[in-house]
Each structure stands twice: as structure tokens, then as C-alpha cells.
Amino acid sequence: MSEQEEVQLPKLGKAPQVRVNGKNWKETKTPFRTSSLSVPLKHRSWERRQKERENLRMIKAKEKEMKDEKEAEHAEKVRRIKERRMAKEEKERLEKMTAILSAKKLARRKRKEKRNKLLRERN
């Protein structure tokens, strides 16, 4: 072959890009074009989006309020249960104390009666 002959390659519209990661079988992504969107998605006005965002904020605020209310009710229920248990424990403690005190009182009376009986028998 002579040096003057040039090899002509077919002209392609665009040279294919070689992927760095080697995943050449995957489809190459194209930039997002809004002109290809459907009409309802393309013509969403700023005011409409703002209104939707505001509605979403209101819904979330209402959900949070309901959740907080439910949590407060639960906390109140737990507090009442704890108070009831504490009152019951206090009542049981007082009953034990009165039982112990009355037992001591009974013992004192028995000793006193025993003394009186002994004194009566002597006389």
C-alpha cells in the first residue's frame, strides 16, 4: 500500500461514549427535557405547587397535633395508674402499721391483765 491512500471511515453522527466502569451494556442516560413531558406535568404553575405544599404542611401539622394529643392521653392514663398503685401501696403499708401497732397494744393489755390477775390472786 502506498502512503497516499487514505482509509475512509463511515461518518457517524456521534461517537459512542466508552463507560469508565465498563458497563457498556447499560443504556446511556440523556438529560431531562421538560418539553417531552405530558401537558398536566409541564404546566404546573408555581402558585399551584405552593398551594399543594401548604396543604401538605397543614395535613402534617394536623397529624402531629393528633399524635401529640394521643400521646398526652396515654401519658395521663399512665400517670393515673401510677397514682393508683402508689395509693394502694400506701394503704397496705398503713394497714400493716396499724396491725403491728394493734398487736403491740394487745400484748400490752395481756401483760396488764396478767399482772392484775396475779394481784387479785394474791389478795
Curated annotation (Swiss-Prot):
GO terms for cellular component: nucleolus. Transmembrane segments: none annotated. Residues 47-105 form a coiled coil. The keyword Nucleus applies. InterPro entries: Cgr1-like. It comes from the Eukaryota. Its main location: nucleus. Involved in nucleolar integrity and required for processing of the pre-rRNA for the 60S ribosome subunit. This is rRNA-processing protein CGR1. The lineage of its organism: Eukaryota, Fungi, Dikarya, Ascomycota, Saccharomycotina. The gene is CGR1.
